[in-house]
Amino acid sequence: AASDVYKRQAQAFAQAGRPVQLAGFDIAKPAVRLAAKALPAAKYAVASSFAQPVRTGWADLLLNCFSPFAQEEFRRVLRPGGRMIYVVPGAEHLYQMKAVLYDTPYKNPVQEVAYEGFRPIGEREVSGSITVPAGQLEALFAMTPYYWKTPRDGAARLAALPELTTDIAFRFLVFEKE
């Protein structure tokens, strides 16, 4: 679904006489293969956010979803005045999943962020809920940091569920390179 959004946006820019180049990086080969199938017009590489295989000042816009903030590399890759959308979990993100995994579930910390060389220009939170069937719960769980620090009994409780309805919350933080 996200690839369709990127494809439509790229087409809209091209029709307006402003063609775009899209590139994506992930440290996971399966994620890169999946992205390349979904949006073949973009260029992809298995790479870390901390060492992106592009020239300095290449990007007008960076989108970083749930990955570490590679401040120096983002500053290098963005052109002056370029923008970055940094997507982080909101306070309630996957709260009901954590209630299954842990004896004492917790909300994600929501903190103000400041990054040298970047000026904050906007923020928006989007939230809702999803119902995840048993067949997809393990995949969702494996994409979270909880996968690596959850006690076995918590993971077993999650695996035993026929489905899980949980909150999702995303904070979109928008910055401009100074």
Where are the model-predicted features located?
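A short acidic, Gly/Pro-enriched loop at the edge of an enzyme's catalytic core
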Residues: 50-62
